[in-house]
């Protein structure tokens, strides 16, 4: 789930879960 994680990271740039 690396791609999903990377995609989520960019999608959650404003509400990141501590993974900037």
Swiss-Prot record:
Cysteines paired by S-S bonds: none
Major localisation: cytoplasm
Tree of life domain: Bacteria
Subcellular localization(s) per the UniProt record: Cytoplasm
One GO cellular component, as annotated: cytoplasm
Listed GO MF terms: GTP binding; translation elongation factor activity
Keyword terms of this UniProt record: Cytoplasm, Elongation factor, GTP-binding, Nucleotide-binding, Protein biosynthesis
Family named by the database record: Belongs to the GTP-binding elongation factor family. EF-Tu/EF-1A subfamily.
Free-text function comment from the UniProt entry: This protein promotes the GTP-dependent binding of aminoacyl-tRNA to the A-site of ribosomes during protein biosynthesis.
SUBUNIT field: Monomer.
Protein name: Elongation factor Tu
